[in-house]
Amino acid sequence: MAQPIGRKPEWLKIKMASGASFAATRQLLNRHSLHTVCRSALCPNLQECWSRGTATFLLLGNTCTRSCTFCAVSKASAPPAPDSDEPQKIAEAIASMKLKHAVLTSVTRDDLPDGGANHWIATMQAIRQRTPNVSLECLIPDFQHKKAALDSVMQATPDVLNHNIESVPSLYSTVRPQANYRASLELLRYAKEQHGLATKSGLMVGMGEERHEVEATLHDLAAHGCDMVTIGQYLQPSAAHLPVARYVPPQEFEEYSTIAKNAGIRYVHAAPFVRSSYHAETFPNNLTITQNL
């Protein structure tokens, strides 16, 4: 049974890390003036990931046009224009970091006619020109479900197409008011059926959902062809954000993993600190999944 809300339980204590690799990663990102979801979203795994010489690149600036109540990324209705040099900067950073698997994500840019799709494509092209052997995992927004934008990004053939479902449908009006649960599921199905992409999604628990709702969402993801799923504990970024409803014990994450696999999801990473891109490079057969569709 979950502990009552109060002090964080032992399993949620972060082990701090630093060292030369951490400093080198930070310096490289600062030198190229790049945003990362690690820093912008206050990810609890920042120290660990940067110490391993990896990071998740945040495209289209660090200001989002949506107001998800769980997210620490800055919000505004009219963010600054995207940096046209960002694709090349990211490509250079990936080459410098010698990454074999790079993870890209972005803020949602409802203010742009294409939602930032062309910027996404330019970034993927720049990376592949600079480091053609790197595999690309793209955690995309919904682009307001505009078919032209989705098709253009999917036709750029990311090795893994990630789109987070984030939560159960009953909480959407609270945690993700400008998104649509069913439409996000359809996006994943479309990526699989129409573009033959390996698909991935993630959700957080501890936001007020019921266990049976998590199980139903995992079955929904499986039914829409999702290959990979991440499940992690929601942690409140600040007092201004959605409060944590409960701390989910590690055993429950193991149970969710079993449920997801039994539903037909091919790979599951479920644990308190798991986030969408956490150890993404270790997901087995990232490329084989695509090749064996």
Curated annotation (Swiss-Prot):
**SUPFAM superfamilies given in the database record:** Radical SAM enzymes
Give the required cofactors. Answer: [4Fe-4S] cluster
Q: List its EC numbers.
A: 2.8.1.8
Print the keywords alphabetically.
4Fe-4S, Cytoplasm, Iron, Iron-sulfur, Metal-binding, S-adenosyl-L-methionine, Transferase
Q: Which Gene Ontology cellular-component terms appear in the entry?
A: cytoplasm
UniProt cofactor note: Binds 2 [4Fe-4S] clusters per subunit. One cluster is coordinated with 3 cysteines and an exchangeable S-adenosyl-L-methionine.
Q: Which Gene3D superfamilies match?
A: Aldolase class I
**Localization terms from the record:** Cytoplasm
- Which positions are annotated as binding [4Fe-4S] cluster 1? 38, 43, 49, 277
- Specify where it is mainly localized: cytoplasm
| Pfam families for this protein | Radical_SAM
Q: In which pathway does it act?
A: Protein modification; protein lipoylation via endogenous pathway; protein N(6)-(lipoyl)lysine from octanoyl-[acyl-carrier-protein]: step 2/2
The UniProt entry's sequence similarity note says: Belongs to the radical SAM superfamily. Lipoyl synthase family.
Q: What is this protein called?
A: Lipoyl synthase
Q: List the lineage, top down.
A: Bacteria, Pseudomonadati, Chlorobiota, Chlorobiia, Chlorobiales
